[in-house]
Amino acid sequence: MIETDRLIAPTAKEREDQLDRAVRPKVLADYVGQPAVREQMEIFICAAKKRREALDHTLVFGPPGLGKTTLANIIANEMGVSLKSTSGPVLEKAGDLAAMLTNLEAGDVLFIDEIHRLSPVVEEILYPAMEDFQLDIMIGEGPAARSIKLDLPPFTLVGATTRAGLLTSPLRDRFGIVQRLEFYNVKDLTHIVARSAALLGVSMEELGAAEIAKRSRGTPRIANRLLRRVRDFAEVKGDGRITSELADKALNMLNVDERGFDHMDRRLLLAMINNFDGGPVGVESLAAAISEDRGTIEDVIEPYLIQQGFMARTPRGRVLTTNAYLHFGLSMPKRLQESQGGEGIA
């Protein structure tokens, strides 16, 4: 199973970006959560507008689904300029980037998603464009080839990535503003769900919003996706109003439990409990036990379980923590309690 098959996958599904546009905040005043990011960006944007300058180039990084694209749109709206969007894999040749840069107006925002996936050739073109607002273009071929410089209007590059560690130092150093987006707490997600419900014309109780929020894995994209599915359930099985009880029934039917775990998460945890006595166990053995490939376990299932403190990586392999046993109403084996007391968790 691939990640986008999962209801609680943080990556966008096909057509989901179009649906999310209806509920995305357009200005900082409507931006919920990330208080430090919101406060800083408000100051930076206000200062740039007072000086009548383009905002400094901005790098936004963090796990998928937390609102990097939303923040880029807000920056453009607050600055009163146009937003041009693309992504790292799309910009295959230097000419692709040059075409976008030469179409920018003064102050415009160029948003590059997955910027860590830019090819080295394209990245080289970006350096002088970011630093000096100049574009170096080669004209002709062979001995007759020559380089010419084109002046570009001042613009703001907003780069987004889920893998900040893969950015090269020269590229990372050219961003004047760097913002990390964190997972959202239940209170902020409840606010987001309630706001989205109002925009979609869905009748909802506050406790219904909270029920969806606490199962959304700290991710607004998942929260909005669950809201749409619970809305379907409310219209067919209820009177259209989302209550706490109805949301609980709908999400249980969708196999999303109170911690935001789905069947893949639970299958892995139960396999470790029943087949490997809680670990330690190697990832290859675990993959064979649940009939998934190693990459799916490492990249799709494991990260959230580790982040929530249900699993740990040790030098000897994966082990479950007390939280995993408590989740299923089980007692942790004494052997594991003793070993975790003296073994380093990586």
Swiss-Prot record:
Top EC class, one word: hydrolase
Which residue windows are coiled coil? none
Pfam families in the record = AAA_lid_4 (PF17864), RuvB_C (PF05491), RuvB_N (PF05496)
In this chain, the stretch annotated as Head domain (RuvB-H) covers 258-346
Q: Which CDD domains match?
A: AAA
Cell location: Cytoplasm
Region ranges (Large ATPase domain (RuvB-L)): 4-184
GO terms for MF: ATP binding; ATP hydrolysis activity; four-way junction DNA binding; four-way junction helicase activity
Task: Name the chemical reaction catalysed here.
Answer: ATP + H2O = ADP + phosphate + H(+)
What is this protein's function? Answer: The RuvA-RuvB-RuvC complex processes Holliday junction (HJ) DNA during genetic recombination and DNA repair, while the RuvA-RuvB complex plays an important role in the rescue of blocked DNA replication forks via replication fork reversal (RFR). RuvA specifically binds to HJ cruciform DNA, conferring on it an open structure. The RuvB hexamer acts as an ATP-dependent pump, pulling dsDNA into and through the RuvAB complex. RuvB forms 2 homohexamers on either side of HJ DNA bound by 1 or 2 RuvA tetramers; 4 subunits per hexamer contact DNA at a time.
Name this polypeptide is given? Holliday junction branch migration complex subunit RuvB
Q: What organism, scientifically named, is this protein from?
A: Cellvibrio japonicus (strain Ueda107)
